[in-house]
Amino acid sequence: MVVSDGGKRVKLNVGGEIFETNASTIQSSCPDSLLAALSTSTSHGSNPVFIDRDPEIFAVILNLLRTGRLPANSSGVFSKQELLDEAMYYGVESLLRLAMLPPPLLGFDASLVSTIVPAADGVPSALTATAGDASLWIAHGGQISVYDWSLSHAGTVRTHLNDITSICRVWGEAAAIGSGSASGLHFYDLSGGRYIGSTHWTDPEDPRIHKARVAAVADSEGGVFASFDCLHRENSVLQIDKSTLQVAAVIGQQSGNSAKTTVPEKLRWLPAKGLLVGSAVQRGVFGCSGYIRIWDPRSRNIVWETNEPGSGRSTRFGDALADMDVDVEDSILFKVCSKSGDLGMADIRKLGEDPWVYMSDENPGAWKAGDGGGYSVVHCYRKQVLAARGGALEVWSSVKEKTSGDPIRRRNFVDKEDDSKRGMISKIEAGGDRLFVSRECMEGVEVWETSSFSGVVSVE
């Protein structure tokens, strides 16, 4: 390496090719890297230090140092792993990571970029992307495959279960998993493939509570929440101590002999309020029925609930919820109506007998009530509500009304018509500005991102 002009210009010999840049370019971008250390050295005389690495990949790395971005054609020439290996060698992995991560997810401007297919038993049964670092855990069969922030395969862990229907990251690299065919909530350390322990719901005074299976899992700082369902349909939500894996509290035990008392199939924790939200929906030839319920784990009491059909305004009777989710940041409940397709929202801070405000989109091209297929999955992510209807994927986004400036919500398709023909959407997850979608009886998980070349759009 040669440093000249008062230390401003640097020459590098990489694989026999000479590269020239400014020392400030290297030192300002990655001051603790190998390149920064070499750029401050002046003891090599007039000959640049020879670095025995691929010069073509280094050209990409140098462009990254100069601009903070990867060249547009780099993804088609080099694999992610090749770029990562070189970035780690030069000590600029953090810079490459920032460049490779997708821009903020805008559902109405997202596109399918890849499909992740596990090597064996490729049909996903559960997935989670809640870590926020763009990583993904896929449960398939009795295995869990881990994909890091670059979606590179980091490893697969074989569990003792034949199938996994619930998965949740509870701390570090530890997963809490449940099965629809085996009792108990089980904990695994995925970094080393180590079984940690299990939690079971039992009651010596009630023989009906036996071999309870897990239907849903949610994590919180104070513990893990899991809904359990027994063969006799007795069900409840357990609060589990992370340090001991022992049951800390039994919340909302019920008989499960009607749609209003079935086991919660979805759990969401609201850290700002210290509340737990659960829901269950049953679908039949006459439509949907179910409930949304909010518990305070401190008192173990229900603080609010709604049952559908059977509550709310009469004009909405028969248009029961198809699914619900929670905007954790703004403490807002969202539900999508099974017949009209309208979106209902309720401020958790102002709940009452009928707190729902309904939004419909008058755009005739966005949705028609006569279209076949009802809603099956709803997921909230960064002020956006993603809803699957059959094989189609829609998003409700918050925008400002031009005249009044008040926030309103608009519905748009995320996918194209050809995308919706690939199969019924069964699961939606989002994390790290990526959208993950799986379809019934289809191998793999679709990865959707907003293009880096899309125009900047403000989403409130």
From Swiss-Prot:
Domain BTB positions: 8-74
InterPro entries xref list: BACURD1-3, BTB/POZ_dom, Quino_amine_DH_bsu, SKP1/BTB/POZ_sf, T1-type_BTB
Domain commentary: The BTB/POZ domain mediates the interaction with some component of ubiquitin ligase complexes.
Localization in the cell: Cytoplasm, Cytosol
Keyword entries, A-Z: Cytoplasm, Protein transport, Transport, Ubl conjugation pathway
One Pfam family linked to the record: Beta_prop_At2g24240
CC annotations in GO: cytosol
Observed effect of gene inactivation: ABCG36/PEN3 retention and accumulation in the endoplasmic reticulum associated with an increased sensitivity to the root-penetrating pathogenic fungus Fusarium oxysporum.
Effect on the protein upon substituting G192E: In eap3-1; ABCG36/PEN3 retention and accumulation in the endoplasmic reticulum
Official protein name in the record: Protein ENDOPLASMIC RETICULUM-ARRESTED PEN3
Tissue-specificity statement: Expressed at very low levels.
